[in-house]
Structure formats: structure tokens, C-alpha cells
Amino acid sequence: MQALKVPPKKILIVGGTRFSGLYLWEELHNRGHEVTLFNRGKTALKKLPGESDAAFEKRKSETQFVKGDRKNHAEMTEKLGSLKFDVVYDMGGREESDTASLVDMFGKTADQFVYMSSAGVYKKSLTMPHMEGDAEDPKSRHKGKLETEAMLRLRGVPFTSIRPTYIYGPLNYNPLDEWFFTRLDAGKKLCIPGHGQHLTGLGHVKDLAVAMANVVGRDHTKGKIYNVQDTQSVTFEGLAKLCAQAMGKKADEVEIKLYDKKMFDFGEKKAFPMREQHFFCGVENAMRDLDWKPQFDMVKGLKDSYENDFKLKKAAGKLNLDFETDDMIINDQRIKAQMFDAIPKSG
């Protein structure tokens, strides 16, 4: 879809050097906005996949960088307090206190305040997909984001909150699709908890960046919350097959071993990268209000991750090849290995 034609804005991104913020920075810069990044400056700036050296250097030269710790209120105020911005993006606030300092400075002066929340705030439900307005879980590990949204509303900030499900794509530091790629590449069975048919929602990071950038200039998004993910969801088994497809492997040869996680003690290790439940959202509101439509279906998106991230990490020797939890499951004689289709046959 065409981006809304808005004049260049002065935009602050708090965060912006790890993953989703990087893509948002590029998207906003490419639209002609004047971007300032505020972060600790500890993460080296990365060129995005497909970006030329010249484009990367141009983006850096046309961006203002301010170093500081967002958790140090005095330092943040000293570094940013005298600056003026039309739009503020908070990409990394986890607790209300993290965002309160930004609100103190820009809550009354910025025209728009965009907050990166999470679909993880929704309460587990018998009816799906999760929609904006559904019951939320005050005990969620993302409860800080819920409290932040409440604070933004209470203080009258012209905010828009974005709730993505699982974000994937090149440069992701959270090994979601990489977990599947690594095991498929090593010829391992894929150990999936439960019955393997839990539906989950994923969204490509580039699609997320476009959705977030599309908030700029759309006054009707103020005070609203939007889910963001792909228009379709996928079962765990289906994701395993799609990852194989992205790697050029035969999906019907993927070997899956289902297990009951209650049978095992994995200690501090995480045996599977996703929550064992249905977890996906409806995105109709974002598509309508943000004039947005995901450009990456899962096959295209996973291939992008495989070609532009996994293969590079493998060549650089940066993959996590710890299969201890996998071997515990695979070697457990209480569980039978099975081959499964991604979608159960009806009838």
C-alpha cells in the first residue's frame, strides 16, 4: 500500500539498534523524516539485508545519535530535554517507569507517541483470534506494558500502541525460526510440545516497521491499540514444514517428536521457543486504520530469514548448537517418534 503523504517530521526513536527499531529507522528515513536515535550506543550499527553500503552510510549521516541510559532519568532529561520532536517512538520500554521519563519530556509537546507493546498481554482465551479490547492478563510477564498503556491513557498522551505477536526476520536476536532452521540443518528431529496443532501468529519485521511508520500523520490512531502480525497463523507442525520448505528441503520428510513438557526438567534451558497455546491475533483494525497490509506471507518471510540471516550466522559460526534438551526428549523411551502432516486430514 502507498504510504500517507506527510511532510517530513522530527522523530525520536528510543532504541533502534537491535532488531525492530533498526527496520523502523530505515523505513522512517526512507520516507524523508528527520530521525534521532537515543540509546546506550553499546550495539554496533548494522546494515540491513539488501541495503547498499552507500545507502547505509547515507542513513547514518542523516541521522542524529544521542547516547544515554533511558533508566537514568536525569541523564535522559539532560540529553533530550531541550530537543523538540513531532513523533516519539518508544521501542524498548518494559515497565511504566521506563516510559514515564519520556512522557514527562514529550507527553504534552509531541503530536504523536508510538509505544511498542506486545500481544503477550492478552489473557489466554477460549475464543480466538485475540482482538483489541479482549481481556488482558495482569499477571502476564508483559504486565509492565499493560501498566504503561494505562499510564499513557491516564496522562492524556496522544499515544498509539502496537501489539505484535512473534516478530521474525533477519537480525532477530530471539531465535524463533532459527530454532527450527538449526535443527533441520543438523538433521535433528524437531521436538514440539503438546499435540503440535497449536496455532501461533508471526509477523515479519519489515511489515511491522511499515505498520509503525504508517502511524505518522494519522490522527485517528491516537488513543488506539493495534495488533500486528501476518494475516494468517500457523500450527507448530506447520511452521516446521514451512521452515523446511524455505531451506529447500522436502516438507513431508520433516520428522517431529511430540512430548509432554511436564515429563521433563530442563532446568533453566528453554526447550522450545514459543508458548504452548493458541496465540494469534486479528489485524483487521490495523489494516483499516493504518492503510496497511503485510507484504510477507510466511513462505516468503521464512525464506528471507533463512537466506539473509541463518546462512550468514552458520558461515560465521554463530549458531547455538546446544541440543541437550532435544536429546533428552529424543532419547526418552516413553515417547514415540512420529511423522505428521502440517494440517490434519479431515474425515
Which ranges hold each PLM region?
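N-terminal Rossmann-fold cofactor-binding loop
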Residues: 38-42, 69-70
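N-terminal Rossmann NAD(P)H-binding glycine-rich loop of SDR-like oxidoreductase domains
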Residues: 11-33
